């Protein structure tokens, strides 16, 4: 169908266009193209003979689209079979029939997809199907016309006569018929390709020498529906022949086609005859004139043309019969009457197709083509209004000031602002966004004293040691602990971001000067104050009279300070600080015994140890010092305890215990714990590390003065530099952190004990200089290390009052609730069972 490859050959003359371009104008539509597309969707039903009208809806979709754009569509349908195409139509009919039979056979075999393809190729659009579309289009007021023979010639006639301004089709033969404007491949949105006859000269292959006649010759030579082409001749070679030939006689040119193309081609006489008939069919095919309502040739006959010899281009019938065929009232094959539509008695109803269209208003070209006063073009109305435009006076050279007050121009709506309420002052407005604590502070400052200063004056009697508070600190806090933490942060200059502080993951600088939680316990039947000042202080506040605890006098204080080397005398300023700390920690409730007897517990302090001696802890311990002197114990027991302390000091990384220890120990144990607890106090700063920071736990666990002397023997072998900072984070295991200036201690190997615990050697020395390792005399030799490494053959003889060493009891780390000798006392059998069983 059509001329193969014509659209690509003339693509320079085509341009994309939307059908809205023809708004207010009339376009003719080759409806059979829409019918073929719509029938493919229901090809299976049509092949089976089942009733369907999906193709009608498909065609009406395009019709409604054109009406929505303001374009008047005129639907054109094919009529009778043209005598020139009988051979072509017969071959097409046979091909459709074979596809139908093949599809039915495939459907029986169960090959549905292949059968559907065969059904799509076997579609035959009948006049009954076209009549359904005609009725549906008439219901919308759309004009329909059935061509006497082919719709292509009828479309070309309407376009050339000016009844329609463009033609919508899928067939390229319309260009050979001489159509002015053709819209090809239009989609459901109105987009397509427009080929204008006036732009055919833009094609480089055609050139300027081509005319409408030569273009038609080229289409016939390349092959069309009316004549098959010669073997090996297409559009390109046909165009070349017509460009080279200067002879106006086309018959002579066809005979010499082999000469022009330099090919061995023999042109038969039948081809020349067929060429002449095809050319006459393109020129003189019969069409119907809807305005005159009669059959007319596409082009007027020439002087040398006999109409009686052009029967292959269509046979004449009566005008009345042709009118009934054009209206669709008669069948094109049998000429039977199938409808009685009359455009004169049944005028088309005027219907609006857009919101902007007014009732009774008819745009140009919307009247029916069956009316005698049909105005096909817009130029008719524009010409009638032309004289009125000339009557208006010319404004050329005139100057006038134009005012726009009377014009209804689009402008922004006036937005009225609500009046400002002047009753509310700026101070009142700012006070709404200020906190209540700030107002309280302002009131306090107006009296001459700030709340923070008054509070601090109560807690700190000495102005020299009073802590400085920030002016922006609110006076009212949720609890005392929050106030204390905030004051410590302000003193240390730490930057606190709300919601981002973590008590577990932080640096040591962020938790300076923090006070630990109080800890107390009541193991078994009595409460004993332990080595830490915090535990002693809080235990005294909670139960001061338990088991005969009494404050000590000044002599006891002097004795305590004399027992601990490196401690200075207690000043009243330090006592003031201790009293302040005790008041702040007094509000905290001690945890129960079950809480203390757990694997994890809060550590003592987060406060940074200073290098200056602080006697505040000794002052605190004065009131808990026993007046009676502790009795001496066996030297063997003290040695064992000392060994245990040394072992534990190594296992814990030479760090002090975070929790206090409770137990049923002797008075000598309490005396030694309270005297040595000054080094690990969480409320005060530790003394200068004369006694060694790593030996603090050992001193706390000594049973008598002999244990204290054993611990003092190790003092010369350790560095006395004060660089060790210990920050105890609550809930985490304690780790020993040393100052960057301190050196690493060397722990030489000693003979191992039977229980598997190692004992510290008394000859272990600390390097006092960074270049000590390079001095030959002070270097440790491998031979000496091997001498020290070994096992003792003779086990120690234990006194009868003690039980033999146990690999289970001696290897476990003592809990904070128990002391060393709790396992050696017969009255503490219950505690042993509770711990080990």
Curated annotation (Swiss-Prot):
Q: Which organism is it from?
A: Mus musculus (Mouse)
Mind telling me what this protein is named?
A: Exonuclease 1
Q: How does it assemble?
A: Interacts with the MLH1-PMS2 heterodimer via MLH1. Interacts with MSH3. Interacts with the MSH2-MSH6 heterodimer via MSH2, and this interaction may increase the processivity of the 5'->3' exonuclease activity. Interacts with PCNA, and this interaction may both stimulate the cryptic 3'->5' exonuclease activity and suppress the 5'->3' exonuclease activity. Interacts with WRN, and this interaction stimulates both the 5'->3' exonuclease activity and cleavage of 5'-overhanging flap structures. Interacts with RECQL/RECQ1, and this interaction stimulates cleavage of 5'-overhanging flap structures.
The record's region (Interaction with MSH3) falls at 129-386
- What does the entry list as the binding residues for Mg(2+) 1? 30, 78, 150, 152
Asked if Nucleotide-binding is a keyword of the record, the answer is no
A single Gene Ontology CC term: nucleus
Query: Which residues lie within the region annotated Disordered?
Result: 345-367, 440-477, 555-589, 608-740
Alphabetically sorted, this entry's keywords are: Acetylation, DNA damage, DNA excision, DNA repair, DNA-binding, Endonuclease, Excision nuclease, Exonuclease, Hydrolase, Immunity, Magnesium, Meiosis, Metal-binding, Nuclease, Nucleus, Phosphoprotein
Cofactor(s) needed by this chain: Mg(2+)
Residues binding Mg(2+) 2 are 171, 173, 225
Task: Give the region (I-domain) as residue ranges.
Answer: 138-229
Q: Where is the composition biased (Polar residues)?
A: 449-462, 556-565, 611-623, 665-690, 699-713
Q: Which residues carry this modification: N6-acetyllysine?
A: 480
Q: What is its EC number?
A: 3.1.-.-
SUPFAM superfamilies for the chain: 5' to 3' exonuclease, C-terminal subdomain (SSF47807), PIN domain-like (SSF88723)
* Residue span of region Interaction with MSH2: 591-837
In this chain, the stretch annotated as N-domain covers 1-99
Record family assignment: Belongs to the XPG/RAD2 endonuclease family. EXO1 subfamily.
- Using the UniProt record, name the top-level EC class of this enzyme in a single word: hydrolase
How is the protein modified post-translationally, according to the record?
Phosphorylated upon DNA damage and in response to agents stalling DNA replication, probably by ATM or ATR.
Region annotation (Interaction with MLH1) ranges:
387-488, 778-837
Q: Which GO MF terms does the UniProt record name?
A: 5'-3' exonuclease activity; chromatin binding; DNA binding; double-stranded DNA 5'-3' DNA exonuclease activity; flap endonuclease activity; metal ion binding; single-stranded DNA 5'-3' DNA exonuclease activity
Please spell out the taxonomic lineage of the organism that makes this protein.
Answer: Eukaryota, Metazoa, Chordata, Craniata, Vertebrata
